[in-house]
From Swiss-Prot:
One of its GO terms (molecular function) is ATP binding. Its main location: cytoplasm. This is ATP phosphoribosyltransferase. Belongs to the ATP phosphoribosyltransferase family. Short subfamily.
Length: 231
């Protein structure tokens, strides 16, 4: 039975993923036509390569339409409800590092923790007659972190369609949940990360669809990639 491995379709993630596979002895033969999103692996007739966006990879793993994929853990946890039941993290690949964080305006000087934010949320309701607005593309992770982990219920998620970090300055939100690598963009927008506001430390991972793990070939490919990382 053939194995389908989904890889990021462009940019540095694609380059770094191909380097990881090469180190594991899987030389990917790229198609001549850049519009062709399928590739093959030299000497591996039963291993199919499919190029997708990182978010598509997370979704297709959840559907079980691909067996293995390389994508960010943040996308896996955000895209898939009950992700632990649907996919498994086979290996952390050591690149694509970024944190999903809770960030508030720097002028909120007395707000440094999630406990402080709980007080702010209640104060917003009492003083302004509305809920605290949080701009984010990570609504699932935000709800889990705020409501389930910290018991904060009085807030409203504002869907972010553009640059999330600009939402507070634009007046469309009071604070944000976003992904950051260095924090420089947050600082440029006069935002600060709460002391206990790191929701997830993410990086690129090799991920398997749970039901695909019954295929011994899937396990073999994942094991070989892990061993390549150790080399």
């Amino acid at each position: 039975m053939s194995v389908t491995l989904a890889l990021p379709s462009k940019g540095r993630l694609k380059e770094q993923t191909l380097a990881v596979l090469d180190k594991a002895g899987y030389k990917v033969i790229l198609p001549d036509d850049s519009r062709n999103y399928r590739a093959r692996v030299e000497g591996e007739t039963d291993l199919d390569i499919l190029f997708l966006s990182a978010s598509e990879i997370a979704r297709e793993l959840g559907y079980g339409s691909v067996d293995l994929g390389v994508t960010g853990e943040d996308l896996v946890r955000e895209t898939l409800a009950h992700s632990e039941e649907r996919v498994a993290i086979e290996a952390e690949l050591g690149f694509g590092h970024a944190d999903v964080v809770v960030a508030v305006p720097e002028v909120w000087r007395d707000v440094t923790s999630m406990a402080d934010l709980d007080d702010v949320a209640a104060d917003f309701r009492q003083r302004h007659g509305r809920r605290l607005r949080i701009a984010t593309k990570y609504w699932r992770l935000t709800q889990q972190f705020f409501s389930q982990k910290h018991g904060i219920q009085v807030y409203r998620i504002v869907e972010s369609l553009g640059a999330t970090e600009g939402a507070p300055a634009a007046g469309s939100a009071d604070m944000i949940v976003d992904i950051t690598s260095t924090g420089s963009t947050l600082r440029a927008n006069r935002l600060k990360v709460l002391e206990d506001g790191v929701i997830l430390r993410s990086q690129a991972c090799l991920v398997s669809a749970r039901r695909a793990r019954e295929n011994a070939r899937v396990t073999e490919v994942a094991t070989r990639i892990r061993k390549g990382l150790g080399g």
